[in-house]
Amino acid sequence: MAVKIRLTRMGSKKKPFYRINVADSRSPRDGRFIETVGTYNPLVAENQVTLKEDRVLTWLANGAQPSDTVRNILSKEGVLKKFHDSKFSK
């Protein structure tokens, strides 16, 4: 089972709000997911992001692949740097 970390669209028309979910890559965008690990609100000036960093790092260590947009969000939040440092510090 290929697992991806990706965005699920919530909110109303013209006012999107996203949850950052861990899901099977074969499930639809807004369909079944395994776990919610954060939120992303692009409408706020500073693009409000909340993350459960420990859970994101756990999923990345277990082989979950982030989507392109989630990869950019994790990079801006510094999570990918922590993951890279923990992976190659051995």
Swiss-Prot record:
Signal peptide: none annotated. GO terms for molecular function: structural constituent of ribosome. GO terms for cellular component: cytoplasm; small ribosomal subunit. GO terms for biological process: translation. It comes from the Bacteria. Keywords: Ribonucleoprotein, Ribosomal protein. SUPFAM superfamilies: Ribosomal protein S16. PANTHER family: 30S RIBOSOMAL PROTEIN S16, SMALL RIBOSOMAL SUBUNIT PROTEIN BS16M. Belongs to the bacterial ribosomal protein bS16 family. This is Small ribosomal subunit protein bS16. It comes from Streptococcus pneumoniae serotype 19F (strain G54).
